[in-house]
Amino acid sequence: PVDRRQRQMCIRDRCSGAGHSDGYVVYARMSDAPAAKGIGAVYVELERDGLTFGNSESLMGFRGIPSADIYFDNVEVPIENLLVEPEDGFKKLMETFDLERCGNATMALAQASAALEYVTNYVQEREQFGKPLVDFQAVQIKLADMLMKVEAARLLIHKAAFNAQNGLPDILESSTAKCFSNEMSREVTTTAMQLMGGYGYNKEYGMERRVRDAFGWGIAGGTIDIQKINIASAMIGRRFNQRN
């Protein structure tokens, strides 16, 4: 049974939106049940006593998203703030991650798609040796490679979202879409930056920002390597013990 009031003492490091959001959904251990069975979720309002935040972090990318540590020092919340019972908490959290992966993949796709659109226009306007860059076969091949990767990622995301229309996306499809989109976004944005030469490396033209953000999406929401482990687990039909 859950006590009338829940007390939290812990640290959540590198939390997006920390100090900016009006409230926080916090998953924490709430019972002595073994392993993940004791994990539930509560809602903690910004004004709760004992809730404080660390310094705002300066990240390589994601400059528009505040990020900081969250500290819970004897934070008490009423039972009405209980969102997920301990018995179901971890399972529901994992299901939510399946949905988050699709959103993450979409953001990675947006970075790559915007980079491709920008550099496609650039290579038609920029000239070398008396003709546009796009007239060189090496540039044409890179454009084609970038387009194929962008469209493949788009289809994987659409597949995961379409098959989830009656529920949440499945872990195999959402992890596949996220993993491919994350890797693709890094490849496409860095290729676009390279095609632009020094202009791509210049903050004035925005391409270097897309590169920085593209690398961030491959870390947020479960790293690329974690997605590959999820994919392998779904293929085999069981989770692997990575600890023993």
Task: List each model region and its residues.
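Solvent-exposed alpha-helices and their adjacent loops that cap or buttress functional pockets
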Residues: R4, S16-H20, D32-A36, M60-G64, ...
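Long, acidic (Asp/Glu-rich), low-complexity accessory segments flanking structured domains
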Residues: D73-K92
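Flexible, small-/acidic-enriched active-site or ligand-binding loops
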Residues: E47-P78
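Alpha-helical interface subdomain recognition
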Residues: Y71, D88, E95-N244
